[in-house]
Design a protein with these regions (language model features):
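Non-catalytic, well-ordered alpha-helical scaffold segments
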Residues: 32-35, 102-106, 171-175, 180
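Generic alpha-helical structural signal
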Residues: 32-35, 39, 106, 144-155
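Short, mixed-charge aromatic SLiMs
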Residues: 1-16, 61-62, 130-136, 201-203
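Metal-dependent nuclease catalytic regions and adjoining charged, substrate-binding loops involved
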Residues: 111-203
Length: 203
């Protein structure tokens, strides 16, 4: 398995990512971490034991004027139940805080329902850094609520664009943000970007 990984990475590096790492040590550290994640995945399941309906499914759907696109990692049927799965390379949140992590998967479930007419029965997150697996049931009522939430979010984005109002929302993730010097929450000044002419925007 490790030999297959090294062979695949050598080919990708040569053809698509020749300048990804500045030093050999950086590449080696990344390789070691990647091999650990790969081993963790095989401790969760054996991919030879099932045949997914789809992998890396390109989801592009128009929800009555709201265009949504994403890549669904995996969809399969298990004992007559439709399950969609997303892989995460990071660490899993504590279980009591895990529900918000299903936000994107609920959107995928909504798109699958719209595309196929079938409601997924469950959505699953596999955190490879652990590993940890979280799974929850879904139904039409939940997906209807997600549809309303998406439309409300889209309306809020449109209002913010019209008013050019983007208030900061400080939180723990700010520690990793590269734009603190531009953020009012950290004493920065966010200079408005000139809008493109209507003709340019339309093209």
């Amino acid at each position: 398995l490790y030999d297959l990984f090294r062979e695949a990475w050598s080919e990708l590096r040569r053809e698509e990512y020749p300048d990804l790492f500045e030093t050999v040590d950086e590449e080696r550290a990344w390789g070691v971490e990647s091999l650990e994640l790969l081993a963790n995945y095989f401790s969760v399941e054996d991919p030879r034991s099932f045949e997914p309906l789809d992998r890396e499914l390109d989801m592009l759907e128009d929800l009555d004027g709201i265009t949504i696109r994403g890549i669904l990692d995996r969809m399969e049927e298990i004992d007559g139940r439709l399950v969609i799965t997303d892989y995460k390379s990071g660490k899993a949140p504590p279980e009591r805080y895990a529900l918000p992590a299903f936000f994107a998967l609920k959107i995928y479930a909504l798109l699958i329902r719209r595309r196929t007419g079938r409601t997924p029965d469950a959505i699953r997150l596999i955190y490879l850094n652990g590993p940890t697996v979280y799974s929850i049931e879904v139904n039409d009522r939940q997906l209807d609520a997600m549809d309303r939430q998406l439309r409300a979010l889209w309306s809020a984005i449109e209002r913010a664009l019209e008013r050019e109002e983007f208030p900061p929302r400080p939180g723990r993730l700010c520690d990793w943000c590269s734009f603190q010097e531009l953020c009012p929450a950290f004493g920065g000044e966010n200079t408005p970007v000139p809008r493109a002419p209507a003709s340019a925007a339309a093209s």
